[in-house]
Every structure is written in structure tokens, then in C-alpha cells.
Amino acid sequence: MHYVIADPHGEYDRYRRMLDLIGFSAGDTLYILGDVVDRGGIGGIDILLDLMDRSNAVMLLGNHEAMCLKAIDQPDNQRAVSHWTRNGGQVTRDALFHLTSEERERTLDFLRSLPDHLDLELNGRRFHLVHGFPADNPHDRLWLRPGPDAESPFEDGRTVIAGHTPVCELWGADQAARYLRDLEGGHIRIFHGHGYVNLDCSCGYPFPQRRMACLRLEDMAEFYT
């Protein structure tokens, strides 16, 4: 089976519970749509180390990994360093520098090697996996924030599977509080639009409605931890 998770943001415990919930095994494939690091704690590095040791896991680059690499590779670029740390990067920076130099370079080399999109075909159905949204340039593929009316731009029927924008902010960041209030004690769910599916259920954010979402591509079954 083929499973997709987006934006774990350091929540290693939820990640481990998700693997247990879906019964992830050597015969399955896991796709992570970026933003493993930052915000949610030092667990982002633990998730990275786990993914690096799995031959059946594929990770895409997210904007937070891109910010991390720019800040680490350009330590004198105060704008890049500040941008990263303001967006939850300090916890990742601290965790990286608790690794041995060999582990740290191996981890950074892994991040540098990541693709920013991937196309799949399963059982006659086509998917385009990307962190933000399909675009002609790498920056936009990481940073674009489509709204709830977004549609797949592909004429061949590919369904876009993405994250980046928390589902509660699809209608605008100023509407997130209303979205969460309207849940009435419930939890955030995967968003299904017109050929566009968003899996970012707000891991790493400080509110109780958040959870980790996972989508099984064969039948579009949803799993949450």
C-alpha cells in the first residue's frame, strides 16, 4: 500500500503512532510531503533519522527544510537565519547541533537531495505529490498557498496531494479561529477539493484540534493520530 503524510512538524510520537495504526510494513511505501522539522519539537530530527534508514520511505522538500538549509549553509546571512528561527527553526537548529558532526552532515546531505514533487500512477489513477502546490518554479512549489476553490491544473486528471497550508487556514489565516471554533470539540480533517487534497491537519501548532493525517492512495482511506 502507498501512504502519504504531510507536515509532521516535529511530532515524532504521532508519527510513530501513525505507523502503528496503518500497520506500516516492508511491503508498503510511505511518502512525506515535507515540513518534517520545526515548530513541534526536536522530534523532527528523529523523524528524519527514521526516514533516512527506510528504503521504502520517500520524502519531498518542504519550505521549512528549505529555510533550514539556507540558514545552515549561509550562517552569515542574518535575514535567512532570522527567517528560519522566527518560523520555529530554533528547535531544529538545537537538535541538529546535538548530533555528531557526521550525523549532522548526513542529515543535511539527505535534505539537500530531496525532490520537491513526485508523480505517481496507481491502479490507473494519477497523483501529483507536492508540498505547496504545482508550479513552474521550485520556490512556488514550496510556498504557494491555494484556497479551498483551488483545482488541479493538470489536464490528464492528476490529483494534487499537498500540505503546507493548514486546512484551518485555507479560507484565510484570519478565519482559522472561526474554523476551529466551528469544530465544536472535533478535530481537523483532510480537505478534499476539485482535484486538490490537503493533508495538513496542523501538527506542530498549539491547539487541541490538531492531529496527524495520513491518506492511503489505493482507496483514499484516511487515518488520524
Question: Predicted segment positions?
Answer:
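Active-site neighborhood of divalent metal-dependent phosphoester bond hydrolases
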Residues: 44-119, 124-125
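Catalytic phosphate/metal-binding cores of nucleic-acid and nucleotide-processing enzymes, i.e., regions
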Residues: 5, 77, 99, 145-154, ...
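Binuclear metal-dependent phosphoesterase catalytic core
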Residues: 185-225
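Divalent metal-coordination and catalytic microenvironments
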Residues: 7, 35, 51, 62-63, ...
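Active-site environment of divalent metal-dependent phosphoester hydrolases
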Residues: 9-13, 38-40, 65-69, 137, ...
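Short, surface-exposed loop/helix-turn segments at secondary-structure junctions
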Residues: 139-148, 172-192
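Active-site-proximal beta-strand elements of phosphoester/diester hydrolases
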Residues: 1-9, 126-133, 197-199
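N-terminal active-site segment of His-dependent metallophosphoesterases
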Residues: 1-48
